[in-house]
């Protein structure tokens, strides 16, 4: 049986279908999901929230045709960190900010603790993120107070 190539499959998807593709990966591992979650005051949106056992991934899905480099990705991840922090406050649960990209940005975990995961590695990340948990930002209600 041939292995599926998530990157090749994702290239022809539009951004909305890409979000659904990322969501399907989390669903396949038993996560409950919510797409396009809106935050208020100030208004913001999280592409995907994937929740399991008191932990949520706040996922920003980036279906860009090219890579953007370190400084661009750091700016994007910082904004996702802010949205994830707000989610902690609204839902009182631990939250991991995450950026999923179409292409491999050759970055793993940025200095702010936000993982950058190319779509072809999303399943492996979901299964094994705890192996890198010392480097990953896990925002919790106790820390946010």
Please annotate each region the language model reported.
Residues 1-46, 50-145:
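Intrinsically disordered, low-complexity Ser/Thr/Pro/Gly-rich regulatory segments
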